[in-house]
A protein has these predicted regions:
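Sec-dependent N-terminal signal peptides
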Residues: 1-9
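Bacterial Sec-dependent signal peptides at the C-terminal "C-region" and cleavage site
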Residues: 8-22
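Enzymes and membrane/adaptor proteins characterized by extended Gly/Ser/Thr/Asp/Glu-rich
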Residues: 46-182, 201, 206-215
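Phosphate/pyrophosphate-binding betaalpha-module
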Residues: 190-199
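Mature N-terminal segment immediately following signal peptide/propeptide cleavage
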Residues: 18-48
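Conserved Rossmann-like nucleotide-binding pocket used by diverse enzymes
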Residues: 9, 151, 198
Length: 215
């Protein structure tokens, strides 16, 4: 599955003379069992040089050199060092590393240099579905510029419980039809500009009264 996702994300990196399906199968066939298992692993890390001890950075590079890593969950970064670190990792990797991040409120949520966008409920409150598309477009263009391929967003929970402490304004609305309309436009804004989307969370999460991160 991960190889197929990489095929979608890195489509522009494959020479036109190569068949995309053939590239995917050839890449998979060349991997050892350990390397295939490694492709199923996602490594979470900050990509700020100040947060990474030398020994941790060397450990990551050793993982890439030995068996590879399938994905990298991007926590926090900065323009001055993150791109250099990502380029180093991608260059050393036998298979392109799929980089993901949880970006609901714009790239600013992970990169101080990024654009901060309104919560989803505020976007829906504008009454203009095209605004959701434009926000998705902004998020996608900025994310791709810093090497991110996959966004863990949007939130498609229906906020039908006013006592919900964790979904609230992260949802587009308490109306399922509004959530569907605006989430679809946001997803199209991401995908049309080269960023994978994730519709989350669990069914019914909008009707809870506890924080799922701590309960």
């Amino acid at each position: 599955i991960l190889i197929l996702i990489l095929l979608f994300v890195f489509n522009g990196c494959i020479p036109p003379s190569l068949n995309k399906d053939k590239w995917s199968q050839d890449t998979l066939d060349k991997l050892t069992l350990r390397e295939k298992i490694a492709q199923m692993m996602i490594y979470r890390m900050n990509l700020r040089m100040k947060d990474i001890p030398v020994e941790k950075w060397e450990e990551i590079l050793e993982l890439i050199d030995k068996d590879g890593i399938g994905g990298l969950h991007f926590w926090y970064g900065e323009a001055s060092t993150s791109l250099t670190m990502l380029n180093t990792m991608q260059t050393r990797s036998k298979v392109p590393i799929l980089v993901d991040a949880d970006i609901e409120h714009g790239l600013h949520q992970r990169f101080p240099e990024g654009t901060e966008v309104p919560p989803f409920m505020a976007i829906a409150a504008s009454g203009r579905p095209e605004n959701a598309y434009e926000v998705g477009k902004i998020v996608a263009k900025e994310s791709r510029a810093v090497g991110i391929h996959w966004n863990f967003s949007p939130v498609v929970d229906v906020n039908n419980n006013p006592n919900n402490p964790i979904i609230n304004v992260r949802s587009f609305s308490e109306d399922p039809s509004v959530v569907s309309l605006y989430a679809t436009q946001y997803i199209l804004g991401l995908q049309d500009n080269g960023l994978l989307a994730t519709a989350k969370h669990f069914p019914g999460h909008g009707d809870t009264e506890t924080d799922s991160h701590s309960s």
